[in-house]
């Protein structure tokens, strides 16, 4: 008998049940990590390669963006005047679905807005088809206030620890 494909990766403990990680689940998790870090590195070629042509990108509460080209156009329009940083605190996957708990930072010159985000990604055939982020608008408001205060008092600026 051949090797059990569900035993290719070590199982994860959930409560008292062991849930085996499949190779596909690991690949999907890696796709999301590579994508987010490519955005951080302003590597839009790598980021774009991780997105499906028919991507649906939604920041809940804001307009939905449809398509890889439109998403990459949005990121490139932010260009040299801004930067993005990410710290992934937790990442979990089940088949095509990948969930992230992270801190994102949007940086516009000396203004830094840092806030928590939970993201849902769906990955099919090695490409992200759905990217839906949830964040708290009040948390974003506080990040804006802290960012503005950090302009006057640099010690108040938020920062992410290294990945």
Each predicted region: which residue ranges?
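A solvent-exposed, acidic/Ser-Thr-rich amphipathic alpha-helical stretch
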Residues: 44-48, 52-96
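A beta-strand edge to alpha-helix "cap/lid" segment located at domain peripheries
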Residues: 18, 22-23, 76-163
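Hydrophobic pocket/interface hotspot
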Residues: 32-35, 46-48, 55, 67, ...
């Amino acid at each position: 008998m051949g090797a059990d494909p569900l035993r290719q990766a070590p199982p994860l403990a959930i409560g008292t049940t062991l849930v085996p990680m499949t190779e596909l689940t690991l690949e999907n998790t890696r796709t999301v990590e590579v994508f987010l870090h490519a955005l951080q590195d302003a590597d839009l070629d790598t980021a774009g390669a991780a997105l499906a042509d028919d991507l649906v990108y939604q920041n809940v509460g804001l307009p939905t963006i449809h398509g890889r080209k439109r998403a990459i156009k949005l990121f490139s329009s932010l260009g040299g005047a801004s930067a993005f940083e990410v710290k992934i605190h937790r990442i979990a996957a089940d088949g095509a679905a990948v969930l992230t708990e992270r801190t994102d930072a949007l940086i516009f010159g000396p203004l830094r807005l840092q806030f928590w985000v939970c993201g849902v990604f769906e990955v099919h055939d090695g490409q992200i088809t759905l990217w839906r982020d949830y964040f708290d608008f009040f948390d974003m408001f506080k990040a804006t206030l802290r960012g503005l205060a950090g302009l006057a008092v640099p010690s108040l600026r938020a920062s992410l620890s290294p990945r």
